[in-house]
Swiss-Prot record:
It comes from the Bacteria. The chain crosses the membrane at residues 25-47. GO terms for cellular component: membrane. It is found in: Membrane. The keyword Transmembrane helix applies. This is Uncharacterized protein YxjJ. The lineage of its organism: Bacteria, Bacillati, Bacillota, Bacilli, Bacillales. It is a single-pass membrane protein. Keywords: Membrane, Transmembrane, Transmembrane helix.
Length: 87
């Protein structure tokens, strides 16, 4: 009546959280996941900071080319030039 098959405990210990081998494997997996997350965050942080340093500042050529800042760009003239055929 009190007899319990030992094979049941062997299978049970494979998934029991206080098993030493299971604990070691669990922490190895946790450390690997943590290492991957830290590596990805470091890579993203480094790549974005490097990209921001290398990019030149964007300046529009239109204000520098215009002699007066109050000039209005004639959009109709630009549209007509686009419609002109080169041939």
């Amino acid at each position: 009546m009190l007899f319990i098959d030992l094979e049941f405990f062997e299978y049970f210990l494979a998934f029991y959280p206080y098993n030493r081998e299971y604990q070691n494997f669990f922490w190895e997996v946790c450390n690997m996941i943590l290492f991957i997350i830290i590596a990805l965050c470091g890579y993203l942080l480094f790549s974005f900071s490097k990209d921001n340093r290398r990019k030149p500042q964007k300046t529009s050529p239109l204000p520098a080319a215009a002699p007066h800042h109050n000039n209005l760009i004639d959009l109709d003239a630009i549209r007509q030039k686009r419609r002109m055929h080169l041939s």
